[in-house]
Amino acid sequence: MVTIRLARGGAKKRPFYNIVVADSRNARDGRFIERVGFFNPVARGQEEALRLDLDRVDHWVANGAATTDRVAKLIKDARKAAA
């Protein structure tokens, strides 16, 4: 099953997440099909905290990709900010 989920990066105690489309059988930070954005939970000041390619997210969801709970919330926030 294809899922849209967070893949952790960054340093210890400084998380940074790539939002990726991946097969659910692959490891969290392993192989993925496409990177559709990023999420920086510790962004400060003018740093960009969230970027999502909503066209690609819509494409994958239309083709049956499931989203995790956290990614669904991030998509909702991105749509709200874009409107």
From Swiss-Prot:
<dbReference type="InterPro" id="IPR000307">
    <property type="entry name" value="Ribosomal_bS16"/>
</dbReference>
<dbReference type="InterPro" id="IPR020592">
    <property type="entry name" value="Ribosomal_bS16_CS"/>
</dbReference>
<dbReference type="GO" id="GO:0003735">
    <property type="term" value="F:structural constituent of ribosome"/>
</dbReference>
<dbReference type="GO" id="GO:0015935">
    <property type="term" value="C:small ribosomal subunit"/>
</dbReference>
<keyword id="KW-0689">Ribosomal protein</keyword>
<dbReference type="InterPro" id="IPR023803">
    <property type="entry name" value="Ribosomal_bS16_dom_sf"/>
</dbReference>
<dbReference type="GO" id="GO:0005737">
    <property type="term" value="C:cytoplasm"/>
</dbReference>
<comment type="similarity">
    <text>Belongs to the bacterial ribosomal protein bS16 family.</text>
</comment>
<keyword id="KW-0687">Ribonucleoprotein</keyword>
<dbReference type="GO" id="GO:0006412">
    <property type="term" value="P:translation"/>
</dbReference>
<dbReference type="Pfam" id="PF00886">
    <property type="entry name" value="Ribosomal_S16"/>
</dbReference>
<protein>
    <recommendedName>
        <fullName>Small ribosomal subunit protein bS16</fullName>
    </recommendedName>
</protein>
